[in-house]
């Protein structure tokens, strides 16, 4: 092990070994050590010109939605309902018709402006101890 470089290669190479590109273990390490700890460029602001315009993308294994909220601010949220994990917005890009993301599965509703859970349509009464502020899209 003493003869390894800081990136674990035995010597300087023109290209990385193929397992660096195809091995699942390297991919998982990169997700944890690189992609989850740094800012990531997702798009130019010009792609979200109108209020309520959005785009969806994947970063690693996370499905993300970027939206210009009703106040004109850009927001990024997990594009996954906190109830049963359904994708909130299937389209790649577009303009929302309202200021609310509604899950197609059980109609949980989230604010486009804040990501906060607004309404739980599948329950007439919330269970004891259920805290809406703990199940936002953030």
Regions found by a protein language model. Give the residues of each.
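Rieske [2Fe-2S] iron-sulfur-binding domain
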Residues: 48-138
């Amino acid at each position: 092990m003493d003869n390894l470089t800081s990136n674990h290669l035995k010597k300087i190479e023109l290209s990385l070994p193929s397992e660096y590109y195809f091995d699942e273990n390297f991919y998982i390490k990169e997700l944890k050590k690189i992609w989850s700890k740094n800012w990531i460029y997702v798009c130019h602001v010009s792609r979200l010109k109108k209020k309520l315009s959005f785009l969806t993308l994947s970063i690693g294994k996370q499905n993300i939605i970027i939206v210009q909220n009703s106040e004109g601010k850009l927001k990024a949220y997990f594009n996954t309902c906190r109830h049963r994990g359904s994708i909130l917005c299937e389209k790649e890009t577009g303009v929302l018709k309202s200021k609310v993301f509604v899950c197609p599965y059980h109609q949980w509703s989230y604010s486009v402006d804040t990501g906060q859970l607004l309404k739980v349509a599948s329950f007439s009464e919330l269970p004891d101890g259920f805290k809406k502020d703990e199940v936002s899209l953030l």
